[in-house]
Amino acid sequence: MSVPTVLEKILARKAEEIAARRAVVSLAELEQQVANADAPRGFANALINQVRLKQPAVIAEIKKASPSKGVIRENFLPGEIARSYQAGGATCLSVLTDVDFFQGSDAYLQEARAACNLPVIRKDFMIDPYQVVEARALGADCILLIVSALDDVQMAELAAVAKGVGLDVLVEVHDGDELERALKTLDTKLVGVNNRNLHTFEVSLETTLDLLPRIPRDRTVITESGIFNRADVELMEINDVYSFLVGEAFMRAEQPGAELQRLFFPERKPAAGGPAVD
């Protein structure tokens, strides 16, 4: 019997978590919350509009921990971090809500969204329509669909539910096979390329560059993982990739928003009164 991978463990735990949540809050109750929720902020449009200007469209991540790195940020105040990111020039936010493996929380998403006016993606392992409706009820503007965690039928179903409740979809791929499946199954405008190898956990920006020619020009490509310095940013920009999802580089900085500005907008003066998060 083979040993389960980290992803398999996460997905098994996620199924248990969803069952427990359903027992507390029904799908019908979530749908009622969605009916009373604020209008979505337009996650995809915010990125697309920035990319059209050939300006960095940064999805700044709010992440406390990960299975591979452990705790990344001890002093973790999602609202302050969100304000710091907005002051630093972020286009959107990504908030981890997985509890068991990333020490995330639904409350972190709500705190971050309430603290700024940026669109927010719920970063979690989405495997059930219940989670999609739940994401909208929490105030998310977009969900993440990870191709390696889903079959094509699941992907299509989750995307349809997202569309029905007004959420954008960012589909995440790691290799050519996953990209082919995503393009065949989904019409989302947002294609995220995760530069982290799921088997070795090594990170290479070449993953984005290798897949780029295979992605239709009408899709917006988001490069994920491995952006740590100006050279990384410039490498992407000279290849016409202007959207970035960055977490760890910001989370390890004393002032996440200032680090965002240093990496992506070095020509700007520091934001006046931008909150220090230390």
UniProtKB/Swiss-Prot annotation:
Any Pfam family matching the protein: IGPS
Annotated metabolic or biological route of this protein: Amino-acid biosynthesis; L-tryptophan biosynthesis; L-tryptophan from chorismate: step 4/5
Domain of life: Bacteria
Keyword Transmembrane set for record: no
Protein EC: 4.1.1.48
Catalytic activity: 1-(2-carboxyphenylamino)-1-deoxy-D-ribulose 5-phosphate + H(+) = (1S,2R)-1-C-(indol-3-yl)glycerol 3-phosphate + CO2 + H2O
One annotated GO molecular function: phosphoribosylanthranilate isomerase activity
InterPro entries found in the cross-reference section: Aldolase_TIM (IPR013785), Indole-3-glycerol_P_synth (IPR045186), Indole-3-glycerol_P_synth_dom (IPR013798), Indole-3-GlycerolPSynthase_CS (IPR001468), RibuloseP-bd_barrel (IPR011060)
Protein name, as recorded: Indole-3-glycerol phosphate synthase
Family: Belongs to the TrpC family.
UniProt keyword annotations, A-Z: Amino-acid biosynthesis, Aromatic amino acid biosynthesis, Decarboxylase, Lyase, Tryptophan biosynthesis
Any one GO BP annotation for this protein: L-tryptophan biosynthetic process
